[in-house]
């Protein structure tokens, strides 16, 4: 049977597709911009048909209606990363959080520590051979589909076709729902003086020919702003946003010096505007792979001069980093931070950077603290922290004693907190 006939046989409405999900199933949603909006909406709309579905995903870009009060009988969310629409549910006990490194998520599915009953995915239209691309969301979505008993795909004509190892054949999909809604977009944030100063300090650590990992938000965008005079930069990152695209167009990022996948931008997912999605569509420079490859520290380390740039909530004077909680309150997750810090530390000539504003709470709270808040999660241990950067400078911690680490961190804290930090330093050292 030709793939076109298979496709037509599997084509149903969103309501019909989700009706195939059985009670008490574990349902994995595609990640971030890849969230299959029509399928999720149909699931929530028909909530009364379900009892005890476990909803698993990382970042949700939608409204997260399945986590709202009154939904507990129908849905229980298991967050692998806590985002804006799921934070309240996790901290109030209506949802759960599973700590994990991003690169390990596919193994949770494949090794059946989290057996997948249903995968709800969003993919591109099929090519002439019947292959759909996972587009903006390869990450754990492809492994989830490969592990699931039931695969329901939202085939969106607006999903870009990304290359690499990013494909699923229509014969491997159980039900197909066609969609034409625009992909969710994330607009670039406005950059303030603090972010620009941090970006400039980070950029001073990046040499020509380096391979970069950056996240999303004001600080990564500020770093990119100060890379315009660099040469032959490369990208091996869990994600990219619009700023990377602009540096490619400017010729700054060309991936020529990469020692792994030379000439290629390697990512596992994307978040940005339609311009970015159009840029990656059928672009042979951009390749996506599942997160157990892209974020594996033993893969990352194969890039010489690998520079990872991540942020956090707090750093204490020993160099311990909390990136996911305020005390006991879970506000995000581990994500790929530790994956890339470890990979950069193992890389020949690599650098692992934690970049943060010196204060929080409108300047009332120092992010550099004597100790992490009670109950705060240690996301990155003091043994793995290399550089810490604020708007006031750079602290290089690798190889330093606890005493010298503390002094270096106090020197880049906000001036109004340095005296109190030094007083705590004197009590301990």
From Swiss-Prot:
GO terms for biological process: acetate metabolic process. The active site is at 238 (5-glutamyl coenzyme a thioester intermediate). CoA binds at residues 215-219, 336. The keyword Transferase applies. The keyword Transferase applies. Gene3D superfamilies: 4-hydroxybutyrate coenzyme like domains, Acetyl-CoA hydrolase/transferase C-terminal domain, Glutaconate Coenzyme A-transferase. InterPro entries: AcetylCoA_hyd_C, AcetylCoA_hyd_C_sf, ActCoA_hydro, ActCoA_hydro_N, NagB/RpiA_transferase-like. Belongs to the acetyl-CoA hydrolase/transferase family. It comes from Clostridium kluyveri (strain ATCC 8527 / DSM 555 / NBRC 12016 / NCIMB 10680 / K1). GO terms for molecular function: acetate CoA-transferase activity. Its EC number is 2.8.3.-. Keywords: Transferase. SUPFAM superfamilies: NagB/RpiA/CoA transferase-like (SSF100950). It holds the Pfam family AcetylCoA_hydro. This is 4-hydroxybutyrate coenzyme A transferase. It is an enzyme of class 2 (transferase).
């Amino acid at each position: 049977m030709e793939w076109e006939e298979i496709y037509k046989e599997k084509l149903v409405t969103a309501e019909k597709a989700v009706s195939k999900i059985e009670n008490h199933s574990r349902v994995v949603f595609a990640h971030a911009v890849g969230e299959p909006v029509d399928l999720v909406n149909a699931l929530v709309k028909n909530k009364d048909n379900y009892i005890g579905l476990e909803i698993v995903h990382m970042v949700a870009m939608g409204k997260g209606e399945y986590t709202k009060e009154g939904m507990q009988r129908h849905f229980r969310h298991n967050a692998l990363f806590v985002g804006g629409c799921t934070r309240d549910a996790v901290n109030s006990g209506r949802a759960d959080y599973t700590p994990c490194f991003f690169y390990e998520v596919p193994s949770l599915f494949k090794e059946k520590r989290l057996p997948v009953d249903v995968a709800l995915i969003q993919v591109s239209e099929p090519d002439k051979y019947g292959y759909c691309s996972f587009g903006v969301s390869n990450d754990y979505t492809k492994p989830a589909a490969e592990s699931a008993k039931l695969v329901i795909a939202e085939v969106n004509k607006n999903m870009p076709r990304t290359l690499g190892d990013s494909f699923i054949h229509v014969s491997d999909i159980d039900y197909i729902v066609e969609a034409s809604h625009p992909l969710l977009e994330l607009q670039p944030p406005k950059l303030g003086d603090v972010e620009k100063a941090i970006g400039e300090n980070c950029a001073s650590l990046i040499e020509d020919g380096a391979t970069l990992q950056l996240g999303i938000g004001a600080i990564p965008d500020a770093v990119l702003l100060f890379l315009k005079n660099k040469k032959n930069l490369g990208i091996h990152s869990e994600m990219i946003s619009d700023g990377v695209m602009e540096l490619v167009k400017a010729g700054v990022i060309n991936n020529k010096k990469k020692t792994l996948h030379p000439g290629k931008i390697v990512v596992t997912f994307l978040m940005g505007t339609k311009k970015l999605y159009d840029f990656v569509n059928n672009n042979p420079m951009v390749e996506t792979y599942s997160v157990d490859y892209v974020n594996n520290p033993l893969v990352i380390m194969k890039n010489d001069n690998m520079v990872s740039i991540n942020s956090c909530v707090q750093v204490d004077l020993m160099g311990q980093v909390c990136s996911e909680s305020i005390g006991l309150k879970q506000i995000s997750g581990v994500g790929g931070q530790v994956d890339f810090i470890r990979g950069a530390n193992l890389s020949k000539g690599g650098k692992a950077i934690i970049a943060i504003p010196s204060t929080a709470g409108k300047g009332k709270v120092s992010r550099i603290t004597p100790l992490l808040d009670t109950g705060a999660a240690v996301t990155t241990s003091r043994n793995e922290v290399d550089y810490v950067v604020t708007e006031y400078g750079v602290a290089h911690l690798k190889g330093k004693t606890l005493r010298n680490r503390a002094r270096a961190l106090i020197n880049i804290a906000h001036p109004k907190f340095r005296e109190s930090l030094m007083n705590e330093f004197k009590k301990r050292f």
